[in-house]
Amino acid sequence: MSGWRKIYYKLLNLILKLLVKSKVIPTDPVAELRLDTTRPVFYVLPYNSKVDLLTLRDRCLALDLPDPLDDNEIDGVILPRYVFIDDGPRVFRYYAPKQASVKLFLDYLDLHRGNPSLDIQMIPVSVMFGRAPGREDHKGAPQLRLLNGIQKFFAVLWLGRDSFVRFSNTVSLRYMADEHGTDKTIAQKLARVARMHFSRLRLAAVGPRLPDRQALFNKLLGSKAIEKAVEDEARSKKISREKAQQNAVALMEEIAADFTYEAVRLSDRVLSWTWNRLYQGINVHNAERVRQLAQDGHEIVYVPCHRSHMDYLLLSYVLYHQGLVPPHIAAGINLNFWPAGPIFRRLGAFFIRRTFKGNKLYSTVFREYLGELFSRGYSVEYFMEGGRSRTGRLLEPKTGTLAMTLQAMLRGGKRPITLVPVYIGYEHVMEVATYAKELRGATKEKESLPQMVRGLRKLRNLGQGYVNFGEPISLNVWLNQHVPEWREAIDPIEAQRPHWLPASVNSIAGEVMVNINKAAAANAMNLCATALLASRQRALTREQLLEQLECYLQLLQNVPYAPDATLPQRTPQELLDHALQMNKFEVEKDNIGDLIILPREQAVLMTYYRNNIQHMLVLPALVASMVIHHRQISRDELLRQAAVIYPMLKQELFMHYVPETLPQVLSPIIDELCRQQLISLQDDTLIINPPRIRSLQLLAAGVRETLQRYAITFSLLSANPSISRGALEKESRILAQRLSLLHGINAPEFFDKAVFATLVATLRAEGYINDVGDAVREQTLEIYNLLADLLTPEIRLTIESVSIAALEDTGGADGGTA
């Protein structure tokens, strides 16, 4: 490098250090992109920009990656370590890649011809200052090359702190040389493919241009579906067409987002400051699969679980920092209050009412608006559960918005639509105390500014946050596999509701919930809560708690629930120390040692965190429970009993194992429990290992309350086979409340209406009850006895005595259909 160029770079570098603070995507490119630092690298940038090059250099040096300004010396040949594909924007939109870049590609490929062991890593890198997509109504001449430097100066000045350096997956030049050759044609193809890659990358990061709101409304009003709905509105309400049209516009105003890049930038500053003070870290996993989907041109629909109002902000914040466009978010109309409503609207929220029933105009306007978002290429986010979970478990999915998503596909859009399930987890949910009150019968407080201020004042140390992206579900692929004829229903004008739609929507919704749970995150809080709640006294010695944490960690590491599930990379001692810092537990010291206590007032709140990961530990807990209560049980008998119980667990906890594969699932769990010496295996019989019985009991407690609930329902059903489904749900809930009071069961979901509704629906699906006749008493009694053998004698006695009393109170039988 010449002397004057070194001076120029140094001066420019000084300015950039003052003005630029770039974020790297992914955060750790060496690990996430599997870069081999022992092999030569070759950086590829889209445009000739020294600012981009020096920004890249700064990040490379910070990450201990090779300096792009240094040359590569390979087999005596010296070549630059970077290349610009294009000179930059020109008057004409189409232009070929620089010949210099093609020549450099050719030189690098040529090196591989004479050196079979050489494998250079080509790394595409994009540097972006700001990500404003612009407006659809913006009409401007193509940027002149002369203005590029001036524009770059102002971009650095204004957006230097909002810049990103995005490293893409490496390309093996050895593979290219071996598979495609090393001639000039391949070099030109490499340059063209790189240009296309950067173009897609920019679209994924910036998104399509934003619409002019009024133009969008005019387009919606011109759609045939809304025109028909307006006419129906005028006729049914006996009002003029103009008035009906005004009603439609008012609904659009109520629903539509008013997304602005400036609001996103400002909120990023505020949220970065907020997260750094409230959270000790935000852990993100599997974001690369989402970036790849966006880059491949998929229309992405994010479907996260819903734990807190914080979910809206956290997911958008994470996506923005992963180099992706924040989505348009379906938010409950209850959040449309000042000032939250206008702020959320500018951050991409569009508002949805709790129910569409009885308002055809509203449902039509909403469906058309959602379809327009898809057709324009905006990513969308909605919560399949409909509302925030009050128990920490996933709720039964509400399928209305998903049905509209499939109907949008039936408009014949060109881009594939893919659902991305997202698990969001917290070590502290700010609304958890409110949830507990609501589950005890308190009226839900309406969202408002005073409530928001009170909530913000309570925010303190929130521990760690977790955002895990689950396995995507391509709607196109799903429909091709399950409904091969789905394209026959495509109609670009009218909303379609083919006969296969309801069943398909329900199946896809179930898969989404299962995939969310497959991406669950175990953490210090939910693991400690699981252990302490397993103790009937809600207290363990420090040694017992550490031993139990080790048991859970070993189980989840050696028999993972799912590949996407994540575990804390900490020792049990580190997890306990972190959990104690959250001030949820008390520590009492005596002459023997420390006692970790879960205070009574915290016990109900802690069930929320335990429930976040109950599905990950419920099968080991079931095995432990069977061994404890039977003292010894053959492997075959354990598998038989588990096969009876598992369908109910699967439906309630959205578990992913197929019932037919249960023996293959339980076998490694049994082996792991034997390895940990919690149980012993003698002549294919599982028996208790007395020295480790305390850990086995604590593990078994993870399924204790669930089995009690099942026993309640089967007790009622076997005593009265003709009881109606509605009465069975109601009586089960009443009996569960009684059991909770008599035996001090603190879990609020123990008598939750939705849990029993799911259980009764599962019994119908499994054939225990039906819509036209009685249940088979012998069958239900057999299953009750199976469950009762897994209960303590006092719990069993209470269930049987209270269920008999309940039946006597209702006259012994309910004549409704089962």
Swiss-Prot record:
GO terms for biological process: CDP-diacylglycerol biosynthetic process; fatty acid metabolic process. Keywords: Acyltransferase, Cell inner membrane, Cell membrane, Lipid biosynthesis, Lipid metabolism, Membrane, Phospholipid biosynthesis, Phospholipid metabolism, Transferase. It is an enzyme of class 2 (transferase). A motif (HXXXXD motif) lies at residues 305-310. It catalyses: sn-glycerol 3-phosphate + an acyl-CoA = a 1-acyl-sn-glycero-3-phosphate + CoA. One of its GO terms (cellular component) is plasma membrane. GO terms for molecular function: glycerol-3-phosphate O-acyltransferase activity. CDD domains: LPLAT_DHAPAT-like. Pathway: Phospholipid metabolism; CDP-diacylglycerol biosynthesis; CDP-diacylglycerol from sn-glycerol 3-phosphate: step 1/3. It is a peripheral membrane protein. It is found in: Cell inner membrane. Its main location: membrane. Its EC number is 2.3.1.15. Belongs to the GPAT/DAPAT family. The HXXXXD motif is essential for acyltransferase activity and may constitute the binding site for the phosphate moiety of the glycerol-3-phosphate. PANTHER family: DIHYDROXYACETONE PHOSPHATE ACYLTRANSFERASE, GLYCEROL-3-PHOSPHATE ACYLTRANSFERASE. This is Glycerol-3-phosphate acyltransferase. It comes from Edwardsiella ictaluri (strain 93-146). The gene is plsB.
